[in-house]
């Protein structure tokens, strides 16, 4: 029997990143989603195209050998598929992990295969597989938890690939940047060995990869979006052509770089080169990346372990500079009532309804005693008072 991977989430990252590399590694991919239209489209089309976009031009890969199941209506089928799968991946958004955990737990519990299934969450979040693992344990009966690791192994991953806004008529096809990084920790697999997926860079310690990526790629992308939105720019590439915005983004990245160099075994020179590469990537006009798309979901992006408060809190704890990150936080706080983005409306509501102290705690998860708290509180007050 051939290799089989279950991919939760049929969105652009699921189809255009994870499934592409699973397909290239020889896996049959079973997409699991709750969106009727997405599942039906995957069921009705036997192939779709992933087009890599770069300055050198375009390269298209046709993805085949996949199926799709609606977990809302066919949960028992999903359980059976997981029971005989080699790999389970997901790209659903960090907030959705708790909703997919119950069916994954049932699927793992139904396994009789001698080799455990590899579970890898592919989310823009630190320790996403650990989070999913925790939810799966909650949905596993107590007498089965101890033997859970005979049936499944859990490895965190760091993913990096920019997926711009897709054309409205693109269907299942995905346009995506050529560059990618997919790092996964190999230690959890022990003597069993990790799955054979050539696109994955298997590492002993994932934290440097995750933090470097989140605090460089995601921080710079969102910073560009929030400053760009504030200044009326429509596209990320246009925003970065504005010398002032580009300078502000570089100042933010100098601060996150100082943390990465201080904390991880990465030299100043190496991080500087990485920063230049990232700014060049997000400046790519061929990606046609929309400012409001990149800025959406500001509540998640302002949260405790995310791209702004995550590095700023660690810098504050180390007594290091974080002023430019606070400028970015202020711009994120000003990303309110953007059409099509529920979180930006909720952000506006929180800032309007709650006192500054409550809003600061609720938005960022920072304790009042934390050294970063006063600086964030100042920005919240400033935005609430409507001062520029």
Swiss-Prot record:
One of its GO terms (biological process) is cellular response to heat. Transmembrane segments: none annotated. GO terms for cellular component: cytosol. The active site is at 213. GO terms for molecular function: mannitol-1-phosphate 5-dehydrogenase activity. InterPro entries: 6-PGluconate_DH-like_C_sf, 6PGD_dom2, Mannitol_1_phos_5_DH, Mannitol_DH, Mannitol_DH_C, Mannitol_DH_N, NAD(P)-bd_dom_sf. It comes from the Eukaryota. It is an enzyme of class 1 (oxidoreductase). NAD(+) binds at residues 5-16. Pfam families: Mannitol_dh, Mannitol_dh_C. Keywords: NAD, Oxidoreductase. Its EC number is 1.1.1.17. It catalyses: D-mannitol 1-phosphate + NAD(+) = beta-D-fructose 6-phosphate + NADH + H(+). Catalyzes the NAD(H)-dependent interconversion of D-fructose 6-phosphate and D-mannitol 1-phosphate in the metabolism of mannitol. Has a strong preference for NADH over NADPH. Belongs to the mannitol dehydrogenase family. Monomer. PANTHER family: ALTRONATE OXIDOREDUCTASE-RELATED, MANNITOL-1-PHOSPHATE 5-DEHYDROGENASE. This is Mannitol-1-phosphate 5-dehydrogenase. The gene is mpdA.
């Amino acid at each position: 029997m051939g290799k089989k991977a279950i991919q939760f989430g049929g969105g652009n990252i699921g189809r255009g990143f994870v499934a592409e590399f699973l397909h290239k590694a020889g896996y049959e991919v079973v997409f699991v989603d709750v969106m009727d239209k997405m599942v039906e489209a995957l069921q009705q089309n036997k192939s779709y195209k992933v087009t890599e976009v770069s300055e050198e031009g375009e390269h298209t890969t046709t993805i085949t050998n996949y199926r799709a199941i609606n977990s809302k209506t066919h949960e028992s089928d999903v359980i059976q598929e997981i029971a005989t799968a080699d790999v389970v991946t997901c790209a659903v958004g960090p907030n959705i992990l708790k909703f997919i955990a119950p069916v994954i737990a049932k699927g793992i519990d139904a396994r009789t295969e001698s080799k455990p299934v590899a579970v890898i969450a592919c989310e823009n979040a630190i320790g996403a597989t650990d989070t999913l693992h925790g939810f799966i344990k909650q949905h596993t009966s107590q007498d089965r938890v101890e033997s859970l690791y005979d049936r499944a192994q859990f490895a965190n991953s760091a993913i990096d690939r920019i997926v711009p806004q897709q054309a409205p008529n693109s269907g299942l096809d995905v346009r995506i940047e050529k560059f990618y990084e997919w790092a996964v920790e190999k230690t959890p697999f022990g003597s069993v060995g990790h799955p054979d997926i050539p696109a994955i860079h298997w590492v002993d310690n994932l934290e440097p990869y995750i933090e470097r990526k989140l605090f460089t790629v995601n921080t710079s992308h969102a910073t560009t979006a929030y400053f760009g939105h504030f200044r009326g720019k429509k596209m990320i590439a246009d925003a970065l052509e504005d010398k002032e915005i580009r300078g502000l983004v570089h100042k933010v990245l100098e601060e996150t770089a100082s943390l990465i160099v201080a904390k991880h075994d990465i030299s100043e020179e190496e991080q500087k080169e990485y920063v230049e590469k990232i700014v060049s990537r997000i400046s790519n006009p061929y990606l046609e990346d929309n400012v409001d798309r990149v800025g959406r979901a500001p509540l998640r992006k302002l949260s405790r372990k995310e791209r702004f408060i995550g590095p700023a809190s660690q810098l504050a704890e180390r007594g290091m500079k974080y002023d430019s990150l606070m400028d970015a936080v202020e711009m994120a706080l000003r990303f309110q009532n953007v059409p099509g983005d529920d979180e930006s409306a909720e952000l506006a509501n929180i800032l309007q309804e709650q006192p500054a102290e409550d809003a600061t705690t609720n938005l960022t998860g920072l304790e009042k005693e934390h050294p970063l708290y006063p600086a964030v509180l100042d920005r919240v007050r400033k935005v609430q008072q409507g001062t520029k």
